[in-house]
Amino acid sequence: LHRFARLDALVNNASSFFPTPLAAIDQAAWDDLIGSNLKAPLFLTQAAAPYLKAAHGAVVNITDIHAERPLAGFPLYCAAKAGLLGLTRALAIELAPEVRVNAVAPGPILWPEDASFDPSARDHIIEHTLLKRSGSPQDIARTVHFLLNDAPYVTGQVINVDGGRTAHL
């Protein structure tokens, strides 16, 4: 803000992702997953709102297809992303007409680099994705770019970028 004196866009992309079987959920997991996936986007948007309104800007939240179709073993992550999906729609109402608020819901794009996601589960997901492959971070970036720059009459929407995964679930 100091350098350009305006804010045109906010992309809430920070996220934590790890399994939380019901019996293993604790306060630390709650704080991490809810904090990064729901709390941070809310308060960042709140802080940015006056500047975004002045610039007639846009917000894009990165949700997940599992916000609406939960992934077994990840109830806290799914709940946090479902909250972000609801927040996206609520903020579209709150910030209109000056600010557009949308979301992108990635499907199988990136996989954890540790052993927290079973390779056979990953293969099963890809098999049940219409395009039979993972997407790339560039697929998400292009969709975010579209929402920020080429969609002036779109707000309160979620675009699934999932290779057809949700059409096949």
Predicted ranges, named:
Residues 129-140:
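A conserved structural motif in NAD(P)-dependent oxidoreductases
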Residues 69, 128, 145, 149-169:
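Short C-terminal tail/terminal secondary-structure segment
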Residues 21-22, 29-34, 114, 121, ...:
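Substrate-binding pocket helix/loop in short-chain dehydrogenase/reductase
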Residues 50, 93-97:
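Alpha-helical segment proximal to the catalytic Tyr-Lys
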Residues 96-100, 155-156:
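Short, small/polar-rich loop/turn modules that mediate ligand/substrate recognition or access, typified
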Residues 25, 70-78, 90:
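Active-site loop-to-helix junction immediately N-terminal to the catalytic Tyr of the SDR YXXXK motif
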Residues 45, 80, 88:
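Active-site helix of classical SDR
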